[in-house]
Amino acid sequence: MRFTKMHGIGNDYLFVNCFEEVVQDPSRQAVLMSRPHYGVGADGLVLIEPSETADFGMRVFNADGSEAEMCGNAARCIGKYVYERGMTDKTDLTLATKAGIRQMRLSLAGDKVGRVQVDMGSPELNPRNIPVDLPGEIVLRYRLKILGQSWLITCVNMGNPHCVIFVKDLEAIDLNTLGPMFENHPIFPQRTNVEFVRVTRRDVLQMRVWERGSGETLACGTGASAALVAAVLSGLSDRTVQVQLLGGNLELSWNAEDNHVYQQGPAAFVFDGEWLA
């Protein structure tokens, strides 16, 4: 089975062109291929599929085999893949995901895709739809106790669930300990992604992310979107920001008119390979 490794600011996935290849058990395949020493090593497996409702379809499987609803970094990589591999000549594309249809706009540098803008859709704030088992119509700076310490959490769904915590010192966060405890906390029936965010200016956020099913990653597009929404709701940032992640930077804007979050950033090829197992 042929595949291509790509990354969006360090959030790396193995992409399979399902116009040409067949993946019988993508969940199991994601686990096997994502292992760094026994497989290829990646944050997960992404299938590029035909779609009856959009230009292309996307399915994302995390490193533990669970299926994600949406991934902004993977979406940008697909935009670059389908254009540069000659699968389309369009620069405005639609992508079918488990979270719905997403619009993408490709910015070209010659015959290559330099950057991709993804319409991440509207944030869902109702706890019943995130989902998070807490009362009320919004979870904004709710006090949650973990390991004897109180954390103020804000919950947002950007196609998948996110828990955002604002901190003063990102380096002091023991993410390998705290990440799984937030991810698997009983208030999150479908688990959650976790973002620790430091606001350096009203237009700059720094972030570390613990992804549901993958652990700490260098970047997360839906997580960056959730961080922006949480920062605006908390009165900590403007609606247009740069989010600085371990793998690089993303530009995001939460549009007040259509309520959509727009994300822009790069995507890169790493290598093509063939899985023989």
Positions of PLM-derived features:
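Membrane helix-loop-helix hairpins that form the core translocation module of multi-pass transporters
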Residues: R115-P123
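Glycine-centered secondary-structure boundary/capping sites
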Residues: G86, N129-P131, R143, G235-L236
